[in-house]
Regions:
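S-adenosylmethionine
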Residues: 103, 142-243
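N-terminal auxiliary segments of SAM/dcSAM-dependent transferases
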Residues: 1-77
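Conserved SAM/SAH cofactor-binding pocket of Class I
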Residues: 92-171
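A generic structural signal for beta-strand entry/edge sites
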Residues: 33-37, 81, 201, 236-238
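Short, well-ordered coil/turn elements that cap or connect secondary structure elements
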Residues: 44, 69, 79, 110, ...
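SAM-dependent Rossmann-like transferase core, predominantly class I methyltransferases
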Residues: 57-110
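Hydrophobic anchor at the start of a short beta-strand
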Residues: 26, 47-50, 136-137, 161, ...
Length: 244
């Protein structure tokens, strides 16, 4: 939201008389020996305008950032905290691929959709999906330790997930949305199975450098998929794809 400031310059004696007559708020910008420069929020009739400035209003959501005070963290109510107990499973929120996936979930996931998280690791993306309003989230990983940690983190965040030690081919359900943050070579091994898991939209991440990106984009041409968005961060790539 923006508003305009109208800048004027008057002799001191004229300015103080203007204040008495105007009866509204002004912002004093500069007071010299002879002249005063001031701003008002509407144009004045009969006065020579010096400048018009566009002022951006900083909303509370833009200005308030989380504050760490010792062992306490102060958060505004519109943020959705995710609690992760650091373990051996991938996904603490520090890696660029995780950060990009979280951003895509924020921007491209629709409340009420069902979702599957392939290679769930710590469960951070699965938890984010539930916090964004998913009606059902299934999380899978081939690593039993990841499955254990994902379940523990779901409990820590008071969200309900279905967590399985499984491969994509083991899942006989389809979902509105899929997130797969995997090593690039895995996409070439299981893409046929991944495409069967979602009906509307998917996030493919874990792609490193442009050579891998080119290979993955070439792979996607073999399937009824359209790249909706491409995101990069620190050499890593994330693709948002829609079923067509």
């Amino acid at each position: 939201m923006n508003y305009k400031e109208y800048i004027y310059r008057l002799r001191k004696e004229d300015f103080y008389q203007f204040l008495l007559d105007y009866g509204k708020g002004v912002r004093l910008l500069e007071e010299g020996k002879e002249y005063v420069v001031f701003a008002v929020y509407e144009p004045l009739q009969g006065f020579k305008l010096v400048e018009v400035r566009e002022i951006k209003v900083i909303t509370p959501k833009e200005s308030f950032k989380p504050i760490t005070l010792g062992e306490f963290v102060v958060l505004p109510p519109w943020l959705k905290p995710i609690f992760i107990n650091p373990g051996s499973a991938f996904g603490t929120g520090l890696h660029p691929t995780t950060q990009m996936c979280l951003k895509v979930i924020e921007d491209f996931f629709q409340e009420g959709w069902s979702a599957i998280d392939v290679g769930c690791g710590s469960g951070i993306l699965s938890i984010a999906l539930k916090l964004k309003g998913a009606n059902k989230v299934v999380a899978i990983d081939i690593d039993p330790q990841a499955v254990k940690e994902c379940k523990a983190n779901a409990k820590l965040n008071h969200v309900e997930l279905e967590v399985y030690q499984a491969q994509p081919k083991d899942i006989n359900q389809t979902f509105d949305f899929m997130v797969a943050n995997l090593e690039t070579h895995i996409f070439f091994e299981v893409m046929e199975d991944l495409v069967k898991l979602f009906e509307k939209r998917a996030v493919l991440s874990g792609i490193y450098k442009k050579d891998e990106l080119r290979e993955v984009l070439k792979l996607l041409r073999n399937y009824p998929l359209k790249v909706k968005k491409r995101i990069s961060k620190k050499g890593w790539f994330c693709l948002v794809v829609d079923k067509v």
